[in-house]
């Protein structure tokens, strides 16, 4: 995989996702072997178990996770075509979903605004992971929870088969459906280079979170990371 394919600026990533917005849901279904729907439901159940009033879904994309979580969610994304897909989806479902055009590296919210912040399949696309994590923590209230759902490298006896699928099937399906070879090559490649497991947990702790955990899903095809912003006086 070419190094330059993975060394993208925010504007390049923004344009790439804009080009594939109309096929993005299908890409996630393909990349996840159809499991992304159940993963989002799992995250939504975790959100429901947390005492919360306001939830921010960063990199909301077409709104799948925000709409699964339900009321009290604000969806933020820097890709306008994605937000338009989310708006149409929410209207079709007759479900309110406030949307905000925002870069995850410069969120337009005051500190300690949200009880829960979620990110699904977006954090590996941050142009600067350290800065992005700092922003996610900044907008969390003390005691608030960050939930990050992200693709990871499979483990166990099925790892070779699952790894082959992630590397080869989505790019071929994506090129066939959209003709955008670069975008569909980038997305699986970004999974293989993104820090995961203990490395990602260390990044969350460095950003200021405590009680950081990781839970592999479906043989490690995806992972759910969780951490809390310390209450006032415990930092």
Where are these regions (language model features)?
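N-terminal, positively charged/glycine-rich alpha-helical extensions of SAM-dependent methyltransferases
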Residues: 1-23, 166
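C-terminal alpha-helical "lid/dimerization" subdomain adjacent to the S-adenosyl-L-methionine
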Residues: 11, 149, 153-203, 207, ...
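Conserved alpha-helix/loop element of class I SAM-dependent methyltransferases that forms part
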Residues: 23, 32-52
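Hydrophobic beta-strand segment of the Class I
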Residues: 24, 117-118
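Class I SAM-dependent methyltransferase SAM/SAH-binding core
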Residues: 54-106
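A short acidic, Gly/Pro-enriched loop at the edge of an enzyme's catalytic core
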Residues: 105-117
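A short glycine-rich, Lys/Arg-flanked "PGG" loop and its adjoining helix->strand segment in the class I
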Residues: 130-145
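Core SAM-dependent methyltransferase catalytic element
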Residues: 210-235
């Amino acid at each position: 995989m070419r190094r330059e394919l993975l060394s993208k600026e925010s504007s390049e990533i923004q344009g790439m996702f804009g080009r594939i917005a109309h096929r993005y849901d299908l890409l996630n279904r393909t990349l996840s072997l159809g499991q992304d729907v159940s993963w989002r439901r799992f995250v939504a159940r975790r959100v429901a178990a947390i005492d919360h009033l306001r939830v921010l879904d960063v990199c909301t994309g077409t709104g799948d996770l925000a709409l699964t979580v339900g009321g009290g969610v604000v969806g933020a994304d820097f890709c306008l075509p994605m937000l338009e897909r989310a708006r149409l989806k929410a209207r079709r479902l007759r479900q309110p979903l406030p949307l905000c055009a925002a870069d995850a590296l410069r969120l337009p919210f005051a500190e300690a605004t949200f009880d829960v912040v979620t990110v699904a399949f977006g954090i590996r696309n941050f142009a600067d992971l350290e800065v992005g994590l700092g922003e996610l923590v900044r907008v969390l209230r003390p005691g608030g929870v960050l939930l990050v759902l992200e693709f990871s490298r499979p483990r166990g006896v099925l790892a070779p088969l699952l790894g082959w699928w992630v590397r080869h099937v989505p790019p071929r399906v994506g090129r066939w459906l959209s003709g955008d070879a670069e975008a569909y090559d980038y997305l699986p490649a970004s999974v293989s280079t993104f820090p995961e497991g203990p490395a990602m947990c260390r990044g969350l702790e460095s950003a200021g979170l405590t009680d950081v955990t990781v839970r592999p899903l479906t043989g490690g095809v995806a992972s759910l990371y969780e951490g809390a912003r310390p209450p006032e006086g415990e930092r």
